[in-house]
């Protein structure tokens, strides 16, 4: 192919991609950005733990999501909406009165370094956790779990129910 044909072909591909990007804006998923009411915020053990959670977790794990501008433009809007819906379904700090005891799982996920998601912290650098912040958040999540009746219940790992009268 000569240079002029390549140029025309490249322009056509570029216009096709641009047209597709404009067309996908018509797909309604991701347009709506609901923030349901907060029924009960998590009772964080201290203000610093609450700040760390708000900075690193609340965008996806609360009903207080601050929807960024890119969350209104497809295909990013689809990914953002999906992440928030999935995050709220797994653990929602804004509906603590309806908590299903997921704080211990969240502590483990933070301890492993799986949360916050890398794709989130690339864009939101303030959500990155230092080692000290991660340790503090894990301790706070474990405290929330214990306060909700989870966590260490005195079980030493042996099967219960034995009374020694056998």
Summary of predicted features, one role per range:
Residues 1-9:
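Short, Lys/Arg-rich N-terminal segment immediately upstream of the first membrane anchor
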Residues 33-53:
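Electrostatic cytochrome c docking/interface patches
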Residues 53-64, 115, 137:
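The canonical Cys-X-X-Cys-His
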Residues 69-75:
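Short cysteine/histidine-rich zinc-coordinating motifs and their immediately flanking basic loops
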Residues 78-124:
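Extracytoplasmic electron-transfer domains, predominantly the class I c-type cytochrome c fold
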Residues 113-114, 121-151:
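C-terminal capping alpha-helices of c-type cytochrome domains
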């Amino acid at each position: 192919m000569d240079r002029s044909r390549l140029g025309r072909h490249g322009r056509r591909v570029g216009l096709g991609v641009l047209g597709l990007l404009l067309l996908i804006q018509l797909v309604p998923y991701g347009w709506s950005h609901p923030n349901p009411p907060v029924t009960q915020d998590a009772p964080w053990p201290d203000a610093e733990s609450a700040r760390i959670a708000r900075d690193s977790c609340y965008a996806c794990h609360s009903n207080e999501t601050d929807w960024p501008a890119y969350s209104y433009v497809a295909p990013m809007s689809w990914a953002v909406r999906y992440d928030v819906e999935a995050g709220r379904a797994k653990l929602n700090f804004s509906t603590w009165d309806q908590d299903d005891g997921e704080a211990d799982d969240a502590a483990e996920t933070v301890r492993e370094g799986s949360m916050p998601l890398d794709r989130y912290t690339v864009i939101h650098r303030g959500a990155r956790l230092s080692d000290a912040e991660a340790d503090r958040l894990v301790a706070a999540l474990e405290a929330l779990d214990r306060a909700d009746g989870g966590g260490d219940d005195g079980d030493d790992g042996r099967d219960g129910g034995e009374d020694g009268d056998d």
